[in-house]
């Protein structure tokens, strides 16, 4: 049961990590875009 629980945690963390990276890259892109203006 512990292995299934850990597997569920990993499956839950992967999308959150990808979303965090995407948001960070998007904010940096907008920040650079504002600096161009």
Curated annotation (Swiss-Prot):
It holds the Pfam family PetG. Keywords: Chloroplast, Electron transport, Membrane, Photosynthesis, Plastid, Thylakoid, Transmembrane, Transmembrane helix, Transport. It is a single-pass membrane protein. InterPro entries: Cyt_6/f_cplx_su5, Cyt_6/f_cplx_su5_sf. GO terms for biological process: cytochrome complex assembly; photosynthesis. Belongs to the PetG family. NCBIfam families: PRK00665.1. The 4 large subunits of the cytochrome b6-f complex are cytochrome b6, subunit IV (17 kDa polypeptide, PetD), cytochrome f and the Rieske protein, while the 4 small subunits are PetG, PetL, PetM and PetN. The complex functions as a dimer. This is Cytochrome b6-f complex subunit 5.
